């Protein structure tokens, strides 16, 4: 904990701009109840009753009203931050809110009141055990949710669903560790611990539960992060038309002139609540046009960063030499969907053919469609969800972040090594115990039991001020 984590702080807690209601929030830290009484008198002209809504004037330094509204006082520890908290709910004009904020700073100067940093209220809720770290992150995720599914999943994380699953796993690991440590402490008993305590069975159960939690976390991360989809191919194969068809709007210019798109056009759409970040790129070809060359170089940069590449071809000609040269340059490890567009000119029906192989970079499927008529667009959407790993009905999962996935995978690896040591019976019991300890440490990092101040600084700096 930093020394400044106990400073009294204040901030405007509502979004910038005009609105019906604006909120100024104070969390009084070490200044405590004495500051709460003094600020109640100075700002509202009255002593605020705990947990009661009081309709009062908000006073300036001369005792004149700046505004009138609702004042709320939450004594510690029964508040969002776990500290003494005052909230002033007035009208949402930016000028009156700035005046009220400055008045709070002036009135609280003797108590060391300062402006809050981004995420500092939620950081204090974490430090004062009102939220664990996964729940604190869910606050920001709920605010930033881009779909109903993401909002509901963030709400479940905030309610503690993710944390409860993690704590249950940790409890099981601790219980198994206790048995192992007891056996290491009393080797003279000569008991076959692994058999007597069914350690292998207990470990298998923990690994199975962890795999389930990791699967749910992957779904939640997909809701939060989405999928980057790059449209690539030669000029005039219908990339811009496909972007417009997927987005349901005319976002990109479509002409019969090759090379119309010279720079990327990006649009985020949603499919079943999953954000798809679709990028239409310049057509890939040999050219002497310097501007087009820059666009083509950027196209390859986007392809390198993509989660999925849609390789567009003209259904009339199929895969030609130029297309083969493009396909050969696609990076390993990036799924490629071969899209044969313009089926309206061939008379062929829309269809999907699964072609996935075992190579590091393989065409996972082939979709025949008409971007112009919309035939087969739903088939393509379905394939994108399948490639992303989205499971129908997975909206009940909790929202997760990349750091959670990293920690879960690391814990999974430690438990896998523990299982290997278990096969060596008592000869590797100390290594078995160590892998359990490391798995527990990685799981605890998710909820914040073992977390550095540097990581906390990064996490909470991404919040808005006043939250």
Swiss-Prot record:
Among Pfam families, the record links this protein to: MMR_HSR1 (PF01926), MnmE_helical (PF12631), TrmE_N (PF10396)
Q: Which GO terms describe its biological process?
A: tRNA methylation; tRNA wobble uridine modification
Q: How, per the record, is the cofactor bound?
A: Binds 1 potassium ion per subunit.
**Which domain of life does this protein belong to?**
Bacteria
Query: Which keywords describe this protein according to UniProt?
Result: Cytoplasm, GTP-binding, Hydrolase, Magnesium, Metal-binding, Nucleotide-binding, Potassium, tRNA processing
User: Which cofactors are named for this entry?
Assistant: K(+)
What does the UniProt entry say about where the protein is found? Cytoplasm
Binding residues for GTP, per the UniProt record? 236-241, 255-261, 280-283
Give the quaternary structure: Homodimer. Heterotetramer of two MnmE and two MnmG subunits.
Family statement drawn from the similarity comment of this UniProt entry = Belongs to the TRAFAC class TrmE-Era-EngA-EngB-Septin-like GTPase superfamily. TrmE GTPase family.
What this chain does, per the entry, is described as:
Exhibits a very high intrinsic GTPase hydrolysis rate. Involved in the addition of a carboxymethylaminomethyl (cmnm) group at the wobble position (U34) of certain tRNAs, forming tRNA-cmnm(5)s(2)U34.
Q: Which HAMAP family match?
A: GTPase_MnmE (MF_00379)
State what protein this is by name. Answer: tRNA modification GTPase MnmE
Which species?
Burkholderia pseudomallei (strain 1710b)
């Amino acid at each position: 904990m930093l020394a400044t984590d106990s400073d009294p702080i204040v901030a405007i807690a509502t979004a910038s701009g005009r609105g019906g209601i604006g909120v100024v929030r104070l969390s009084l830290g070490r200044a405590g109840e004495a500051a709460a009484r003094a600020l109640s008198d100075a700002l509202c002209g009255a002593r605020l009753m705990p947990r009661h809504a009081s309709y009062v004037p908000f006073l300036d330094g001369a005792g004149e009203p700046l505004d009138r509204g609702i004042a709320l006082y939450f004594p510690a520890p029964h508040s969002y931050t776990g500290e003494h908290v005052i909230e002033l709910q007035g009208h949402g004009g930016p000028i009156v809110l700035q005046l009220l904020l400055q008045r709070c700073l002036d009135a609280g100067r003797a108590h060391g009141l300062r402006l809050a940093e981004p995420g500092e209220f939620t950081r204090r809720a974490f430090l004062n055990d009102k939220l664990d770290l996964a729940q604190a992150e869910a606050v920001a995720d709920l605010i930033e949710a881009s779909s109903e599914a993401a909002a509901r999943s963030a709400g479940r994380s905030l309610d503690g669903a993710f944390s409860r699953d993690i704590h249950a796993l940790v409890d099981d690991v601790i219980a198994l560790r206790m048995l192992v440590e007891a056996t290491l402490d009393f080797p003279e008993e000569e008991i076959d611990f692994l058999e007597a305590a069914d350690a292998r069975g207990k470990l298998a159960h923990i690994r199975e539960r962890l795999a389930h939690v990791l699967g749910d976390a992957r779904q939640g991360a997909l809701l939060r992060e989405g999928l980057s989809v790059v449209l690539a191919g030669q000029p005039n194969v219908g990339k811009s038309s496909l972007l417009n068809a997927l987005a349901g709007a005319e976002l990109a210019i479509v002409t019969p002139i090759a090379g119309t798109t010279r720079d990327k056009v990006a649009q985020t759409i949603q499919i079943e609540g999953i954000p798809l970040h679709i990028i239409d790129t310049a057509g890939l070809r040999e050219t002497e046009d310097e501007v087009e060359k820059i666009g083509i170089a950027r196209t390859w940069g986007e392809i390198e960063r993509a989660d999925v590449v849609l390789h567009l071809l003209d259904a009339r000609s199929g895969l030609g030499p130029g297309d083969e040269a493009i396909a050969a340059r696609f990076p390993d490890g990036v799924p490629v969907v071969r899209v044969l567009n313009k089926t309206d000119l061939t008379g062929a029906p829309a269809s999907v053919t699964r072609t996935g192989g075992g190579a590091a970079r393989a065409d996972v499927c082939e979709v025949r469609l008409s971007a112009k008529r919309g035939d087969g667009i739903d088939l393509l959407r379905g394939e994108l969800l399948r490639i992303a790993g989205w499971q129908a009905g997975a909206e009940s999962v909790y929202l997760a972040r990349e750091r959670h996935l990293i920690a879960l995978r690391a814990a999974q690896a430690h438990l896998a090594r523990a299982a290997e040591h278990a096969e060596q019976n008592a000869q590797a019991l100390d290594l078995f115990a160590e892998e359990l300890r490391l798995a527990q440490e990685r799981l605890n990092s998710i909820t914040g039991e073992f977390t550095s101040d540097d990581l906390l600084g990064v996490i909470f700096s991404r919040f808005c001020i006043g939250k």
